[in-house]
């Protein structure tokens, strides 16, 4: 696994021990034991708690009518069915042009639930943003193998392909997620400047924000991202720092990233991209930054020098 990708992994809930199901009570017990892991798995694949809960619930409905006499590994059966349902959902989104799943297309209540789940489960916000760039098959193969240690022969069953092809899909996903690409030498310290800016903005530290920006800094913002009548361009370090208070709730859902090749951040409540910040940095200070709506064709990746 690529070094950058390893840093994103969080330990999923332990998989329950498998046993031959002989009674309905045993089926209920095994499913309840597996449910936290299934929900975590479905959330990583779909990026939506609402959709993940639907997938897990559908798995239970199918489990109630399955022929358990022919199943030797209930936990594996639950995983396979859940993953197939998730794959179907991703492919349906792809056909509708809904990949990646953007924040603006999600109801506020679902977005809040996604944000709470992301923080409770300690899911990497950057990873969810980047997973949205993968094809459905790549995302399923990567999540199952690299995050949940599902063997490739089982993944092949989910994807209806050969194990070798499943392995290639996971490998391609890994490359897309972790390949550092060409990074300008001068950006070596930019990641920490962006990280410090976001930390100060989250904490409301106006003096620290002023210190991180050039005196004549200019901040521009897409008018669709601010309330009606709000200034779309602000000039001066103190004025820009004061203005960040209006974006405090969004800054809490931000992660430093390279945006279209330059230093920036992605605001992604619940892991769903909403907006991009792009910074122009000169002499160790932020000289200009812009806030724009996230577009599906925006190029985003991790800073190589941030954990």
Kindly label every feature range from the protein language model.
Residues 16-54, 58-197, 205:
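Active-site-adjacent scaffolding segments
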Residues 215-254:
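A solvent-exposed, acidic/Ser-Thr-rich amphipathic alpha-helical stretch
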Residues 262, 279-287:
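Short, solvent-exposed coil/turn segments at beta-strand boundaries
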Residues 263-270:
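Short beta-strand segments that buttress and anchor functional surface loops
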Residues 292-307:
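Low-complexity, intrinsically disordered terminal/linker segments enriched in charged
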């Amino acid at each position: 696994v690529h070094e950058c990708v390893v840093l994103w992994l969080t330990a999923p809930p332990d998989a329950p021990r498998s046993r031959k199901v002989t009674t309905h009570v045993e089926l209920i017990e095994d499913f309840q034991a597996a449910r936290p892991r299934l929900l975590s798995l479905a959330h990583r694949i779909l990026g939506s708690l609402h959709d993940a809960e639907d997938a897990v619930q559908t798995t239970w409905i199918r489990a109630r009518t399955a022929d358990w006499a022919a199943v030797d590994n209930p936990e594996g059966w639950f995983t396979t069915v859940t993953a197939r349902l998730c794959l179907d959902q991703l492919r349906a989104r792809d056909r509708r042009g809904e990949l990646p799943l953007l924040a603006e297309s999600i109801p506020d209540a679902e977005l809040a639930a996604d944000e709470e789940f992301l923080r409770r489960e300690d899911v990497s916000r950057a990873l969810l943003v980047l997973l949205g760039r993968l094809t459905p098959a790549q995302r399923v193969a990567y999540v199952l193998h690299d995050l949940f240690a599902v063997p490739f022969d089982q993944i092949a069953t989910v994807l209806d392909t050969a194990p070798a092809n499943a392995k290639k899909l996971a490998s391609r996903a890994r490359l897309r997620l972790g390949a550092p690409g060409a990074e300008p030498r001068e950006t070596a310290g930019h990641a920490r400047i962006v990280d410090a800016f976001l930390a100060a903005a989250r904490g409301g530290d106006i003096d620290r924000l002023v210190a991180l920006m050039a005196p004549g800094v200019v901040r521009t913002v897409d008018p669709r991202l601010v309330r009606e009548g709000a200034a779309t361009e602000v000039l001066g370090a103190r004025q820009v720092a004061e203005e960040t208070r209006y974006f405090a709730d969004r800054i809490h859902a931000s992660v430093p990233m390279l945006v279209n090749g330059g230093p920036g951040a992605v605001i992604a409540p619940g892991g769903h991209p909403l907006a991009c910040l792009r910074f122009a940095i000169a002499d160790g200070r932020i000289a200009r930054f812009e806030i724009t709506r996230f577009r599906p064709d925006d190029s985003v990746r991790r800073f190589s020098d941030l954990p």
